[in-house]
A protein has these predicted regions:
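NTP/phosphate- and nucleic-acid-binding module
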Residues: 1-442
């Protein structure tokens, strides 16, 4: 099938409770979206997979959760106060504003088409500033963090002093970041409030290449576990002129979105730039004491950076399917079972038959001993329930009918188990249905 359009995904995401426009009843706010009940669970499942693969399966990782508000000197040292900006131009005719580096023609307004109406470029800092405490003076200015990485760098010394890790080791963090984007767009791809999952991995200067390849492999395995087809995920080796001046290598992991091939994640070798900047800015030594070699030095850093919202969008796009079933076109999300917000739905064939409802609730209670995400759905006829669960990405629908109760004696205590991806149904005992669920989730 053809790849779904962005509008198709946006519609499904709202219809099935994955993502809603932010502040919708007030007309919304550009660059903001709220995650609904199923979106929250899917997002948590993505986080848990990342945490397992990037942190828990390793012996050299330490998690931190740094504050969103930090001493403003942090951002001065990191260069964000002076350099976290985009060049903007204004059109004197239509009064619209544009990124200067995104214009195809620097002399023509892309909105109104007028020639010679674009002014000189000026820098616009993308950090959100606010005030700490009751004071309104300049000294009270603090920023909503534009990235999560700084929180790990400023806690480097704390972790070393508390845990005495041997190199190489890494810090990991999941958290919100805020960027005053000029033109947030493409649904949840470019947001003003976003969530990041990042690692800062500290190595000796001469050993970075091996670790870089190791993290690149982990990122590709992560993409595979998310259900992203290998032919939609690409590596872009960032050239010398486009890399940060301190980076010897940067690889962008790109994904084929409906609006083009765009950056999904990034992997960068940052040298000792960050620790050096914060050591100079704080006047506190961040050198690592190697007890075996009796050396003190600033470790170098490899940074695998994953944007959670962009990943969420890629997962929905990769899972979207349309096919013909029962003479009708249906839509379903072929989510990997470990990501699906609902693992199975249990339903009585008829909701107005107390004996069916009671038995269905018993079956659901048993299945929830295997996994808590077992949904109940008795709204509408059974066909509508199936279609609804298909669009949520539920792997199995389990129906309790009169045969379950013994109307056909040899079928007593059996259920109908329906498979999401094929629509096929099979008759299993309640115990067998539980084992099928357990095997799928293992």
């Amino acid at each position: 099938m053809e790849k779904p359009s962005l509008d198709t995904i946006v519609s499904l995401a709202k219809r099935r409770g994955f993502v809603f426009p932010g502040s919708e009843i007030y007309g919304g706010l550009a660059g903001t979206f709220d995650y609904g009940p199923h979106g929250v669970v899917l997002k948590e499942n993505i986080k848990n997979l990342w945490r397992r693969m990037f942190v828990e399966e390793r012996d050299d990782m330490y998690q931190v959760d740094a504050t969103i508000l930090m001493n403003p000197r942090v951002w001065e040292a990191s260069g964000h106060v002076a350099g976290f900006s985009d060049p903007l131009v204004d059109c004197s005719n239509c009064k619209k504003r544009f990124r200067a580096d995104h214009l195809e023609d620097a002399n023509t307004c892309p909105s109104c088409g007028k020639h010679g109406t674009l002014g000189a470029a000026r820098q616009f800092n993308m950090m959100f500033a606010t005030k700490a405490g009751a004071s309104e003076d300049e000294a009270a200015t603090v920023y909503l963090r534009p990235e999560t990485a700084a929180g790990m760098f400023v806690n480097f010394k704390n972790v070393v002093d508390s845990f005495h890790p041997k190199l190489p080791f890494g810090l990991a963090q999941i958290g919100k970041a805020f960027r005053n984007e000029i033109a947030p767009r493409d649904f949840i791809f470019r947001l003003r409030e976003l969530e990041q999952m990042e690692v800062e991995y500290f190595v000796r200067a001469g050993e970075w290449e091996k670790s870089f390849e190791e993290w690149l492999d982990i990122m590709h395995r992560f993409a595979n576990k998310l259900g992203l087809a290998s032919d939609t995920v690409h590596e872009l080796e960032v050239g010398d002129g486009d890399r940060a001046h301190y980076s010897k290598r940067t690889v962008d992991i790109e994904y084929d979105y409906p609006f083009g091939r765009k950056e999904l994640w990034g992997l960068a070798y940052r040298g000792d730039f960050d620790l050096s900047a914060h050591q100079n800015g704080s006047s506190v030594s961040l050198e690592y004491q190697d007890e075996e070699l009796k050396e003190k030095f600033l470790p170098h850093v490899i940074e695998p950076s994953v944007g959670l919202d962009r990943t969420f969008l890629a997962v929905l796009l990769a899972a979207y399917r349309e096919d013909e079933l029962g003479g009708e076109t249906r839509t379903y999300l072929a989510l990997p079972a470990h990501l699906a917000p609902i693992k199975a739905m249990v339903s009585p064939l008829l909701k107005n038959k107390p004996e069916l409802v009671e038995k269905a609730r018993e079956v659901r209670a048993e299945l929830r001993k295997i996994h808590p995400a077992i949904a109940w759905d008795d709204n509408g006829n059974i066909g509508k329930r199936y279609r609804r669960q298909d669009e949520i990405g539920t792997p199995f629908c389990i129906t309790i009918d009169f045969d379950t109760l013994g109307e056909t004696p040899e079928l007593k205590d059996t259920v109908t188990l329906r498979h999401r991806d094929t629509g096929e149904q099979e008759r299993l005992t309640i115990a067998e249905a539980g084992e099928r669920l357990r095997a799928t989730l293992s």
